[in-house]
Amino acid sequence: MLMRKKKLLSRISFGSLFLLCGTILSACTWIQANLRNLLKETTGKDFDLSKAIKIPEGRQNLINSLKKSYEVNPKDTTKLLLDAWKQSSEEGKLGIADLDFDQVTNPTEKDPFKNGAKGRAFRHWISKY
C-alpha cells in the first residue's frame, strides 16, 4: 500500500500542482501578499504575481520558486497553498468541469467515487495540466 502511494505521488507532477495553486493564488490579494512575502523570504526574488502568471516564463519561474520555497519552508508553503485552494473552492473558481460537486455532496445516483474512481478522476484532471 505504501509503495502504491509513493508511485502515485511520483506520477503527479508537482509543477502542475504548483501551477494550479499559483493561478488560484493570483486571484486573491491577501493570499497573493502572503505568497509574495514567502517567496521573497525563501528565494530572495520579488515577484509581481499578476504579471508573472500571464506569461509562460513567469509561470515557470513561479513554479520553480514555489518548489524552492517548499524545500526551505514546507509548512508555510503548504499552508499557503491549502488556504488558496480552500478559498478558490469556496468561491467556485477551481475550474474542474469534469467533476459534478453537487452530485458528490448530494448523490442522487450511485456514489461516483467508489472503487478507485476518485483517484482516476484526480489523475485525469491533473494530467490536463
UniProtKB/Swiss-Prot annotation:
Lipidated residue numbers (N-palmitoyl cysteine): C28
Covalently lipidated residues, kind S-diacylglycerol cysteine: C28
Protein origin, superkingdom: Bacteria
Record keyword DNA-binding present: no
Cellular component GO terms, alphabetical: plasma membrane
One Pfam family matching this protein: Lipoprotein_3
Membrane topology, as annotated: Lipid-anchor
Keyword terms, alphabetized: Cell membrane, Lipoprotein, Membrane, Palmitate, Signal
Keyword Metal-binding among record annotations: no
Signal peptide: 1-27
InterPro entries noted in UniProt: Lipoprotein_3
Subcellular location: Cell membrane
Stated family: Belongs to the MG439/MG440 family.
Protein name in the entry: Uncharacterized lipoprotein MPN_654
